[in-house]
């Protein structure tokens, strides 16, 4: 999708579709929805829809007016953004996405009026100037670009009769306020982030026979060449050389070799510290190994590499946005398969750190590859770590399909990430990693075991990872419940969500 900015009068713009936002006026009869754009032409064109309550301004409600009087656009699309007091870039991103998905089967280009203020009445609860997290109109433009780009694709690539419906071009209409450079930069940033999230989604969507560890490494290397960062991909011999026994143990049952993907973004002039280490679980297909999963739903285990894909997508955006901070990306890719060579429950593996691990359940494999990945990122110089993984079904049970789980061992680092979350619009919820939980992963025959029993599974998995980060500030994202969109929603297709890409980018930018 191409995105442009324009300062033309929206009512005078000739376009297939013009998108205007509406604020929810409330439930009382006299609280009419307010169109975002201050225009007599829009007000007149939408008067009948407002009178008939086809437009209320409720979040994601969409009404269409064909051949609107006084407006040169062929159709006027009014999208609700909810109440003014709760309207942030989170709602705006959704609204832009919903408009794109509603239009993309019928038009190839559209325009949207960026919110500046609601104007008019004195009541700040209904007509307040929009207070976005990073300051007004630029944040709005960025959110529109992100939401529109992410909403555009559908994931039916392997239909033999596939028809592609995508919006080719979007114009964001902004006032001529003398801040053109800021708005252009915000638009480009949103476009890069949205495209990088879609890059991640493309990786996650591929079936296991078309996304092996080797292929994932090839895709990462190709991306790195395109954006100008270093990427090295290592396999079995390197894992043995580095004594990555935990990582190797997961891959040993598969005919497909593992891939350790190492990406480096090192801008000239960046300080030697901090160095951010992004570590992702890249299990390209997870049968569970000898502790095999039920057949029902196993096809979805192609997305068990969503954490690794998120790190690859984030590194793409980082390279293009060029923050002044060093970043290392480490993705541990493998298949978890049963065979005569596969690891067994009761085996003891030695991690790169030297810790011994009793294998209780071979389906608790993600934490094994991350254990070596986190330790290796530290060896490469990372001063701050963040990992992402579709790690536990327990996190899905606890938080459902709405929030990812967040764990952190450092309050300052977590607070920085919490601010990044607000800016990204991604939904995550912090869970505890108290030392009391450590008892649950103790083993009588090894330093630790790879599962902690029935209860608190997401927490005990995080406690396991904590054993491999030491005192390094670290954040763990358990994205198991939110990496895959089970059903389409107005602003997002069914399929991979690309979760964690935006928040990780915001975190990195906060350092540089």
UniProtKB/Swiss-Prot annotation:
Mn(2+) 2 binds at residues 281, 286, 304, 365. GO terms for cellular component: cytoplasm. One of its GO terms (molecular function) is manganese ion binding. It is found in: Cytoplasm. It comes from the Bacteria. Belongs to the peptidase M17 family. Presumably involved in the processing and regular turnover of intracellular proteins. Catalyzes the removal of unsubstituted N-terminal amino acids from various peptides. This is Probable cytosol aminopeptidase. It comes from Koribacter versatilis (strain Ellin345). The lineage of its organism: Bacteria, Pseudomonadati, Acidobacteriota, Terriglobia, Terriglobales.
